[in-house]
Swiss-Prot record:
Belongs to the SulA family. The gene is sulA. Residues 106-112 are annotated as: FtsZ binding. It comes from Escherichia coli O7:K1 (strain IAI39 / ExPEC). Component of the SOS system and an inhibitor of cell division. Accumulation of SulA causes rapid cessation of cell division and the appearance of long, non-septate filaments. In the presence of GTP, binds a polymerization-competent form of FtsZ in a 1:1 ratio, thus inhibiting FtsZ polymerization and therefore preventing it from participating in the assembly of the Z ring. This mechanism prevents the premature segregation of damaged DNA to daughter cells during cell division. Keywords: Cell cycle, Cell division, DNA damage, Septation, SOS response. It comes from the Bacteria. This is Cell division inhibitor SulA. GO terms for biological process: division septum assembly; DNA repair; negative regulation of cell division; SOS response.
Length: 169
């Protein structure tokens, strides 16, 4: 049976195109930056929301980095929460400007499945964009933890881009 050279070229083009599509989908990244606003008097609500995700991410070979302002993670709490003690790293007592900078560096490396940082103030658009780029580059998740007091929460405007843990009673 005779096939024209055009038909052969079309099938080789189709094969090459499918290889390009396959390579481009393999290289897509799934980084994520999210803010979690929680009430200081209800820290358990935040744990209920985040622990299942952190437990699942703990199954990866990568680390989990906690950038905490002053408090130190309890070894007992980490184990009781079902998080892998051998994959949890903590750096404490960072100033807010160093927290964002450290998050960007850590996310960009790809060594961490998740980077969690505490900030009292809102991110600037530039800081948020920098974090998103770093998370995409490292294929990692970043969580900005923002505590609010019960009294200030009532006057704060709700944003659809933030997770407000007090909505999950």
């Amino acid at each position: 049976m005779y096939t024209s050279g055009y038909a052969h070229r079309a099938s080789s083009f189709s094969s090459a195109a499918s290889k390009i599509v396959r390579v481009s989908t393999e290289n897509t990244t799934a980084g994520l930056i999210s803010e979690v606003v929680y009430r200081e008097d209800q820290p358990m609500m935040t744990q209920l929301l985040l622990l299942p995700l952190l437990q699942q991410l703990g199954q990866q070979s990568r680390w989990q980095l906690w950038l905490t302002p002053q408090q130190k993670l309890s070894r007992e709490w980490v184990q009781a929460s079902g998080l892998p003690l051998t994959k949890v790293m903590q750096i404490s007592q960072l100033s807010p400007c160093h927290t964002v900078e450290s998050m960007v560096r850590a996310l960009r490396t790809g060594n961490y499945s998740v980077v969690i940082g505490w900030l009292a103030d809102d991110l600037t658009e530039e800081e948020h964009a920098e974090l998103v780029d770093a998370a995409n580059e490292g294929n990692a998740m970043g969580f900005i933890m923002r505590p609010v007091s019960a009294s200030s929460h009532a006057t704060r405007q709700l944003s659809g881009l933030k997770i407000h843990s007090n909505l999950y009673h």
